[in-house]
Amino acid sequence: MTTIVAPPIKSITSIDNDDNVDGVIEKSVKKPVSLTFDQIIDRFYKHILTWDASDLSPKEKELKPVKVSFNNEEDYITTYEPLLFEECRAQLERSIEEGEKDDTSEPTLSRVRYISEVNDFLVVGLVMAENVNIFQFHDNDLIMISLHHPLIVFGMDEDEEMTDDEDTAPTSAATHVGAPTKSTTTTTTTTTTTTTTTTTATTNIIDDPNKTTEDIKKKKKVIPPSKTPITEQNRTLHLIGTVEHLDNGGIKVKFYVKGIKGDRARQVSLLLRYEIDWWTTKLCNLSTLQREFAALYQCSQSNFMKTLMMRDDDGEDGIVMKIPPLLHDQFSSTYNDSQLNALTSALEGNAITLIQGPPGTGKTHVILGLISVLLHSTIVPKVKSGGNNLGDHLLKDRELSMAEKRDLWNISQPWFNKEFPHIRDNYELIDYDFEERDQKRKRDLWRKLRDTGSVKGGSTKRRILLCAPSNGAVDEIVSRLIRDGLLNADGRKYNPNLVRVGPGSHSDVESVSLDYMVRCRQQLMNSNSAIPSSSASTAAATSGSSRSTQDTSSIRTLVLDEADIVATTLSFSGASLLTKMAGGFDIVIIDEAAQAVETSTLIPIQHGCKKVVLVGDPKQLPATIISPLAIKYKYDQSLFQRLQEKNSPHMLTTQYRMHSLIRAFPSRHFYQDLLLDGPNIPSRATHYHSNPFFGPLVFYDLSWSTETKPGGGSVFNEHECKMAMYLFQLFTKVYPDEDFASRIGIISPYRQQVLALREIFKNYPGISIDTVDGFQGREREIIIFSCVRAPVEEGAGIGFLSDVRRMNVALTRPRSSLLILGNTKALSINKDWNELIQHTQNNQQLIPVTKDQPLEIIIPTFTTRELFTELSEKGQQIVIPKPRTEEEINLQKQKDIEKRKKQHKRQKQKSKENDKKKQLKKRKELNNNDNNNNNKESSNKEVQEITNAEVVKDTEINNTKRARTRR
């Protein structure tokens, strides 16, 4: 089993003080220990499962910034490990705060079926109610079991009610697109069996792309009453665990109680032995983070560790290849110079090659060429000083196939061959020239290996792992591979043996998905169909196919072994299905590499590859990171971005997407003015450009518009929404015979604006409306870009609209026309936006839209060139404020921080006052109850005294009567 060098771990207080717990990472590096893969995974969970879900405060003192280069493996691991845990903490915190997006994640009641201890972990079997869908749980799900409802654990009172408008607000400006969105729930308790109860719920998602704020119906969260009395000691009693797998109608969960501080672990461990109901809540899934963590440790055993550390004394260690002549000739006619240079750069001796693909430069086309080149190029031998011979060096850089090893063995030991005549049987067989001929034979063998990569001629079969951060990016390349195919060594087109692996793939690529291919192979085997004689591997797999069913796992392995290209996401490349493949992969190609954190990029590198090609653009949007602290310490930086500090990427410079007037600013501002127009760009000039209000580039200045925050969340600009609609109506009015809906895309940085635009354009389903982040990688003929930001407060910032990478993505989506809607007064405080506004102003592309008349009256007049010239001249006269300096920005940030601190202080004070009011109310109720009890006691006492007095009086009267009678 592979052993990994790990940094030391210091123990934390637990139930047993003798236990050394994998919890907190020690700052001072001591002698490293060796960890197997299972120990790495245990280390990951021992850290996370000790967390207190009711107090997930960050630990900044454990973090350190990502550097450009690292001293050694320990320096590398101890930098990224705390940052990975911080991001995990932030994801868990967000999941707890906002809830899951669907009602399948609602808390339910469960009971313990069994408990066992395995390798310091507490393994618990939980059984659910019959009406609970246990298939909502998956391997590596993080769950919480608690004595009381999770909302009580997180700080709410049992009698507290909360409506949706209090608890759910639109996604804030700082929220990254793609992150979980806030949801609200309504929970009711229903009895299902004699011992087990569960809950049902309805979830409303304010951030649903098909709904606006007005669509959300107000509901109330009601916390079911607890069966166990709530006390300060048991209010937050809970454990965090991870689901191992489904288990006979329930789930098998792993907990780690030894590392938990305080008395919580002991109390829960005792209560687990009793037949009581536990609230079980699904929090999030840790599969990707677990794979990143394992890859972080395993990378120390990879061929790329020196490259990852980026030490100056490290030389290149990769293999060198050359393109076959016929294939090179074919590429010369179908690829431009920058694309061809990128292809040849991947064949150089660099272990990792960087290819930068700005928008519209044919990045996917280059990836297809890369696959053709890397599958069919021949290996160029390295000549190093001090070596014994050429074969020794080739053997170091390449693993020989079994056939090649057998040929070498036969050459070196021919007497083991049955047909070899023994020398003692015939002395005439003595060959005194054997040594010389043997040397010649070896030289010929290695020459053939050098020229073809195989002793049998032709190229050895190489295997490529093709990855991207998202399913959409993977499916885009796979669909192009299916449609366009590849080129072989002779420059002829062919369809490669391609397999798409992993869940979430698009229906367009189903024909090459692993599950589909396995089903087809099973049907073929079970139908007793004739086996094609050309497929020896299939014949071997179907020997004895008289059985009605086949081993799915074996068929899956067979399909993967036959594949030339395996395509999957970065995360799924760490699944056991691929990590256990025999032989691994020779080459890894990662698309959109600049959109992945470095730890994600490490996952596919585990497969023993000799070469990695990273394709991406660090000038566009980075990976989505939840933790602001992790971003502060550069955890969101991609491996591509860090490596380019030392190694300049090969940039594609010819763009085929944007009209030259649209391309001009992004090229100058983001790409050092290196982008050139392809031969097709003149065709981007269309007939509707005769109306200059339709582009190619127009900035409509709504300097009087204002933004609002419905519910205090995401930003919304009503005036820009109306402007977008009236511009679309103007298109259809001027050109009534044309379908513009399918050619227009409307984008905005803010989700609430997107929701409002979708509501306005709901009768035009052909129009694509999305966030800037959601539109990355896509394009439309016409793009309307709503900037939204127009804060009322003077000096206020423009939020994440100031991110220059988001700005780049927005400006590079259109082919023919880009219409920008924005408030120049608000945007010009930012340096980058100020330059764009100045650019449009200098080129007579800035059109002021006044508020003297309603938009529905002004915009229909935007049809004549004379009016455009008149308005653009007014636009040139607009005084654009200077952007804020760095000092002013920092000062504003400090003011914002102070403002937030004051708001937090006021909220805290208000919360304390509310708590005091609640306490006073409870005290009054208690006093009233006590007074009532005292009054009752006093009244009872008086009644008793009166009764006693009457009894005494009656007794005296009776005694007097008796005495008289005696007389």
From Swiss-Prot:
Keyword ATP-binding: yes
Name used for this protein in its record: Probable helicase DDB_G0274399
Record carries keyword ATP-binding: yes
Annotated Gene Ontology cellular component terms: nuclear body
EC number: 3.6.4.-
Low complexity: bias regions: 928-937
Any Pfam family hit: AAA_12
Highest taxon of source: Eukaryota
Residue ranges with Basic residues bias: 900-909
Residues noted as binding ATP in the record, renumbered to the chain: G357, P358, P359, G360, T361, G362, K363, T364
Broad class of where this protein is predominantly found: nucleus
Group of enzyme by EC: hydrolase
Annotated Gene3D superfamilies: P-loop containing nucleotide triphosphate hydrolases
Lineage: Eukaryota, Amoebozoa, Evosea, Eumycetozoa, Dictyostelia
Coiled coil: 890-949
InterPro entries given in the database record: DNA2/NAM7-like, DNA2/NAM7-like_C, DNA2/NAM7_AAA_11, P-loop_NTPase, SF1_C_Upf1
Record-level Gene Ontology MF annotations: ATP binding; helicase activity; hydrolase activity; RNA binding; transcription termination site sequence-specific DNA binding
